[in-house]
Amino acid sequence: MNKPKEQVVHVEHDVAYLPTPNTVEVVITNDLAPAELTKTAFMVPVCDDGGIIIAVNQRRGLEIAGGHIEADETAEDAAFREAFEETGTTVSNVVPIGFLRMTSTAAGVPEGYAYPFPLSYQQFFAGSVDNVEPYTDNDECSAPVKIFDMQDRRITRKSITLFGNAALKSVL
């Protein structure tokens, strides 16, 4: 029997960083989200010993390394770059592991809102860690941490656990 191409594994409603009302779905798939609706990309660096490298954002705490896709980049390029900037890791054997699908049913596009509306995506990838450079804390991130247990108490967002598990299954 074939595995479903796309699996919605978690749903949240009225997430604070999006125009409300909204729905955010965590989708596990090896397909890419539509590029024209994807403005951010993330990378889960997976170590040979089964750990994953997680960024430590100064304001938000533990998170998967990622950020905005620049005009001259693909989502994969941006995820690779962000992983290096936020964790000091370089990766290879990169594979897509899923995306956040964010849908807003707000009455209109809020003033200054810079993302596709009413539907947008955040793309997630996983890759095998090739190298970890020494990391110097900066105004965005502190030194990254290696997580071995996706139930680690320091993980406060369900999406980290879900994409972390998907990364481990895809890369190891």
Task: Pin down the residues of each PLM region.
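Active-site-adjacent beta-strand/loop module that shapes the phosphate/pyrophosphate-binding cleft
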Residues: L100-E133
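Conserved Nudix-box catalytic region and its N-terminal flanking loop in Nudix hydrolases
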Residues: V46-E86
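Acidic, metal-coordinating catalytic segment for phosphate/diphosphate chemistry
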Residues: M1-F42
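A short coil-to-beta-strand element that immediately follows conserved catalytic motifs
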Residues: T90-L100
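NUDIX/MutT-family hydrolases
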Residues: Q122-S128, E133-A167
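A structural signal for short, well-ordered beta-strand segments
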Residues: M43, P96, F125-G127
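Short acidic (Asp/Glu) patches
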Residues: V27-T29, A75, F80, M102-Y113
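Short, solvent-exposed loop/turn segments at secondary-structure junctions
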Residues: A35, L62-E63, T103-A106
